[in-house]
Amino acid sequence: MTLLLTFEALDQGKIKLEDPVTVSAYASSMGGSQVFLAENEVQTLETMIKCIAVASGNDASVAVAEYIAGSEEAFVDQMNQKAAELGMVDTHFEDCCGLTDSDGHYTTAMDVAIMSRELTVKYPQVFEYTGIWMEDITHETRQGSSTFTLNSTNKLLKQYQWATGLKTGSTSKAKFCLSATATKDGIDLIAVVMGAPDYKARFKDAQTLLSYGFNVSDLYLDENTDALEDLRIEGGVEDTVPVRYQSEFRYLDTEGNSLDGVKKTIELPEKAQAPVAKGAEAGRAVYLLNGVEIGSVPILYENDVAKAVYKDYLFKIMEFYLL
């Protein structure tokens, strides 16, 4: 969740990767997995992200939380708000790095999967960090300069050829946990393992889950590159308006259906009434499998078309007779 809120703040322009982040005494005191940041040490936000994503640095997590929200407590409030927004009904955070082993700090595999999906789908640039296996950072403190090597805690990156990330975690109460992502043949999967008895078991179980997922999954992809006919406009300054698909269409089947049977139908009116706004929905492309709708893609107006007034009709009449 710390990474999710960090990338969200980056996307909103509240912070930048090159921002300097100063380490507080509290952040530097964090136990567990750490990158040994010193009090008053300054690192860029991007370096802090690497410390969190690669080495699970609890000290870096707290430093970033304090930088974004002013305090870890305020940041944790944001974490719980985001969890509620995402429908993570079985999750409650009490810190930003997972060190707390109290009954009030809890989650489930499903909720972690929801959170991981939100992070990776909205901010795929996270893979630039979670995919790092090893990288050096430089500590600049009053004691001088020193190099520290970040080693990924996600051993699946080397053990499973399709792995792309994402994040490990462990405490004495939670045991060994992992949210793992992988990509194969255009299919992106997330596997979440919690409560594994040892650190090797979580990677083995995640690999088993991911391999199973790929074996039972089949992807239907329509890039929607076919041209759509212009739509007639009534009462507008233009007689027609171009339309376009909003996006490609993807459907993941896990039931063993033949995706050759997918049919696409275009739902558009014969004509539209002016005015119309660019980007507004004109209709949709509907996808059916065995007669059942499996999804749709909005079809949008490509341009604005204003409503015609008297002078517009006059110009059209003059154009007709003069040309």
Language-model region placement:
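Domain-terminus/edge residues, biased toward the C-terminal soluble/receptor-binding domains
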Residues: M88-H92, D103-Y106, M110-L323
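Active-site-adjacent loops and short helices of periplasmic peptidoglycan-processing enzymes
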Residues: M1-Y123
